[in-house]
Amino acid sequence: MKQAVYVASPDSQQIHVWQLDSAGELTLLQTVDVPGQVQPMAISPNQRHLYVGVRPDFGIVSYHIADDGTLTAAGMAPLPGSPTHIDTDRQGRFLFSASYSFNCVSISPIDTHGVVQAPIQQLDDLPAPHSANIDPTNQILLVPCLKEDKVRLFDLSAEGQLTPHAQADITVAAGAGPRHMAFHPNHQVAYCVNELNSSVDVYQISNNGQEYHLVQSLDAMPADFTGTRWAADIHITPNGRYLYISDRTANLLGIFTVSKDGRVISLVGHHLTEAQPRGFNIDHSGNFLIASGQKSDHIEVYRIDQNTGELTTLKRYPVGKGPMWVSIRGAQNS
């Protein structure tokens, strides 16, 4: 099984395309020069398109993904603000872009060729939205707003319009700073990493996906850590057994075990990683984690122990300057 790994390096305006084999080895396939500082990336649900957000000319570049994982540019569309995080709906019809600095979220249609078009809606006055996350039902968009310590909830219509959800916004602990989210594969639990206190909140999803209730909040840092907390990313293994977060001050990956129903997580350890791990991801087999070092200009591959979730370092690889994002496309026909 061979997968494709995409690493976005904004300071050199590049995407490095790698092939990941079943042993965890990476082979460089392509280096793509991007028209701007590339940061957030998202892969279409059918795994045939890669979308990347760029600045300072704010926009989304659409790429077609070949069978071997290499990229061909297919189009570019404008955005109303600097893209911080992007996601697509689960049918590949719409792309959502959260702009932290411009306090907005925009919705862009995706045409039948998989190319993102100009936005059709813009939601303003959102205090520092750090991500836009479509829920497992494809009906609700969750937007963590870091500066107001809330996760905003919006209903998504069939036409790609967002309206406030019936449930009140989720309020997190004061000063926590909600940032990125992940969903358990059972679709019944959501996780949110909080940037400013490096904690993880666990939410039970009920009423056919319509309600979110906090069931646990857990510190992700070592007990003796006294530095500034600065969490970044969060991902869960495809089997739902292990959850990971990154902290950029400590240069750590936090390792959690997850209960069978997803509602209880337990911190079991930490693994030192690349300098300032802004982004990481887990491959589709659940065997490997790949982390990027924004200050090291390298990525590092780890093997995930299937019995404990602990990480074993395999190899590090040079990439572009200031790598911030890692996306992984599954093996074709797998």
From Swiss-Prot:
InterPro entries from the UniProt entry: 6-phosphogluconolactonase_YbhE (IPR022528), Cycloisomerase_2 (IPR050282), Lactonase_7-beta_prop (IPR019405), N2O_reductase_N (IPR011045), WD40/YVTN_repeat-like_dom_sf (IPR015943)
GO MF annotation terms: 6-phosphogluconolactonase activity
E.C. number(s) listed in UniProt: 3.1.1.31
A GO CC term attached to the entry: cytosol
Catalysis: reaction(s): 6-phospho-D-glucono-1,5-lactone + H2O = 6-phospho-D-gluconate + H(+)
Pfam families in the record: Lactonase (PF10282)
SUPFAM superfamilies, per database record: Nitrous oxide reductase, N-terminal domain
Gene3D superfamilies assigned: YVTN repeat-like/Quinoprotein amine dehydrogenase (2.130.10.10)
Pathway: Carbohydrate degradation; pentose phosphate pathway; D-ribulose 5-phosphate from D-glucose 6-phosphate (oxidative stage): step 2/3
Keywords assigned: Carbohydrate metabolism, Glucose metabolism, Hydrolase
GO BP terms: glucose metabolic process; pentose-phosphate shunt, oxidative branch
Function of the protein: Catalyzes the hydrolysis of 6-phosphogluconolactone to 6-phosphogluconate.
Family from the record: Belongs to the cycloisomerase 2 family.
HAMAP family: 6P_gluconolactonase (MF_01605)
Protein name according to UniProt: 6-phosphogluconolactonase
Species annotation: Yersinia pseudotuberculosis serotype O:3 (strain YPIII)
Lineage: Bacteria, Pseudomonadati, Pseudomonadota, Gammaproteobacteria, Enterobacterales
